[in-house]
Amino acid sequence: MPFLSDNRTLAAGAVVANVLDGKFNRVLQENSKVTVAQVCDGDVASTIIIGRELLMDDQLTLIESVAGGSPRNPEDIIAQSVGRAGEEVIVKVRNTDAANAQTVKTNVYIEPL
């Protein structure tokens, strides 16, 4: 089961088009169930797309329950769907805070069907 993760600090007002950019398994190798878990330490909005399916559109991400904690499965799942071989998984993040940097942590679980 492929696993992708990302941990980054976003500058105030920053946008990252796809936190999975450059990771091999962001493009599905076969039909798969895709699960995205994410936490942040402040005001971060996320957009999640699998292929042509928009699962989450610029919605606030869960605040981490444990300071410095990583996303937990199943507690911090924010989206889950099935994608087809060749489709790309996109997780866009945006710091909605105009004054402070925010940390966002993302885990993506890919389970072939």
Regions of interest found by a model, annotated:
Residues 1-113:
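Beta-strand-centric surfaces of beta-sandwich/beta-rich domains
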